[in-house]
């Protein structure tokens, strides 16, 4: 009789362990799906910010070109820098497959840090160029 109880309890423990393993596997796959969705959201937000920045810079560049007509050497250099920044922004619109494979293993915080570093690397020069261009424009108007 004791043997039957031992077998029954062992069976219950084994089935409970199997269920917990199954639940762990399911929760792990759910976490992977959520991480993948978060990556897509982050990329979507980054793409939207980059496209908004690009359109603003294009409008600014067109405005400068229309307003000044002929450019001085300094204006020409500023426009060259803006065009280089625009090319950099265009290259960020289409991330390569390799970078996507690299980011799959990162957690959300690491991914957010990567995007922040890229934004700082791009937005710093862009803001300084826009600031200097606007400063030159204000000097010419004033």
Curated annotation (Swiss-Prot):
Expressed by the skin glands. InterPro entries: Bombinin. Disulfide bonds: none annotated. GO terms for cellular component: extracellular region. One of its GO terms (biological process) is killing of cells of another organism. The modification Isoleucine amide is found at residue 141. Coiled coil: none annotated. The keyword Signal applies. It comes from the Eukaryota. Residues 19-43, 72-121 form a propeptide. The modification Phenylalanine amide is found at residue 68. It is found in: Secreted. Its main location: secreted. Residues 1-18 form the signal peptide. Keywords: Amidation, Amphibian defense peptide, Antibiotic, Antimicrobial, Cleavage on pair of basic residues, Cytolysis, Fungicide, Hemolysis, Secreted, Signal. Maximin-y shows antimicrobial activity against bacteria and against the fungus C.albicans. It has little hemolytic activity. Maximin-Hv shows antimicrobial activity against bacteria and against the fungus C.albicans. Shows strong hemolytic activity. Belongs to the bombinin family. This is Maximins y/Hv type 1. It comes from Bombina maxima.
